Amino acid sequence: MTLRFPDLNGWLAWQETLNPKAIDLGLERVRRVWGRMGPAQLPFPVITVAGTNGKGSCVAMFEAIYRAAGYRTACYTSPHLLRYTERIRCDGEEVGEQALCEAFERVDRARGHGPEQVLLTFFEFGTLAALDLFLRWSPDVAILEVGLGGRLDAVNLIDPDVALITTIGRDHMAWLGEDLDAIALEKAGVMRPGRTAVIGSRVPPPALRARAVEIGAEVAQLGLEFDVHRVPDGWHWQAGGSAPLAMPSPALRGPFQLDNAAAVLMAVSVLAPRLPVSVNAMRQGLHRAHLAGRFQVFPGAPTLILDVAHNGQAAQALAETLRAFPCPGRRHAVLGVLRDKAVGEILEPLLPLFSTWDLGQSDDARALPVADLHAAVMAAIGAGVDPACVRAHASIAAALAAARARAGVGDCVVVFGSFTTVEVALRASADGTGVTP
């Protein structure tokens, strides 16, 4: 096969210039191209995961559980941290660059020629390539993570057998709406009539369940159709009138991960007639699931913690997890955010937890200028603070180095605010893996 570009970097750089709009929500373009590439529906079970926070964690748990049960998995997630190939995985392994380039070529040819050629966005190109690869891999189950919203996201091209919607918060409001009900309706777009929609929130916006009932979807909501019960050595999962199942604490750290795990187990149980999973495989999967950048801990002096929290809801979850994490010394924040984020909502739950703030600006064109971030942090902290406690740096790498330099042996350095911020710290780590003790 002759390729437009011989390497992955060439393909990705070109895709970023293909459509003048970085985000152009809608399904018409991907439907036209996919109609020339593959069947309307994939010939294996599909789980679609939507929501504001927790999507990646849920995908990681699905993957680990189904692999523990002996099934072949295919996963599509976004964004990536270190390598684009992280987005597309088969049986836990990243797609090879050559195979991905060939998939890109097939997508490119299916776009057509001349004035009728379809101008795909960067995300749409990757989504179609992932679906093309999944057809060739023929896994037992595919897990798809929505990129933005749900209703008009390219992933919604495929009808899921089960839709899981995690928590819903205020993020991407320029595209999804200003209030939670409006955002919920966009997420609800991944639901399908006659199929199960798992809602992984105890108190979702009312519009979410109402929409499920309106279209005739089967609803399973945390706290109603299924629930979790904490016990001293773990937790119990229970659906309907069934007997409670004892489960270990998820390997992914944070009190909210129990809700994510419960929602995942509910979806697994819905698909059990087609994909039976033993209780032991569920336990193994929850114990093995790992995801970079989600309260990822690098022990040392000081301890380094990486978390991609980038909105108010995720910042609140990070604050709760930090309070439960042993840190005998002081906490030092390394922060960089994107321009479209509500900085005040990110700062509010975290301000009381940190002694110092080192601020930086990533190379991402969407990054908030560090001078603006510094002003926001100073305003949030208020008068009387020692200016030396809040310092602005030219880069995330410089901010991280400064925080590490002033941290003591028992201290914790916490890097958060965006995927690109965490990427810098992850590249600077010893082996890029981290552990969660």
Where in this protein do the model-derived segments appear?
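Nucleotide phosphate-binding/pyrophosphate-handling subdomain across enzymes
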Residues: 45, 141-146, 153-164, 168-170, ...
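Acidic, Mg2+-coordinating active-site environments of NTP-dependent enzymes
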Residues: 114, 118, 140-145, 160-248, ...
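C-terminal helical cap/extension that packs against the catalytic core
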Residues: 198, 202-220, 231-234, 303-306, ...
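N-terminal leader/targeting and accessory segments in enzymes
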Residues: 1-53, 57-72, 81-83, 196-198, ...
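ATP-dependent carboxylate-amine ligase catalytic core
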Residues: 7, 21-23, 27, 31-35, ...
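Short Gly/Thr/Asp-enriched flexible loops that form oxyanion-binding sites at enzyme active sites
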Residues: 62, 151-161, 426-429
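Active-site-proximal loop/hinge segments that shape catalytic or ion-binding/gating pockets
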Residues: 418
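Beta-strand->loop->alpha-helix junctions that form or flank phosphate-binding loops
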Residues: 76, 198-201, 213-230, 251-254, ...
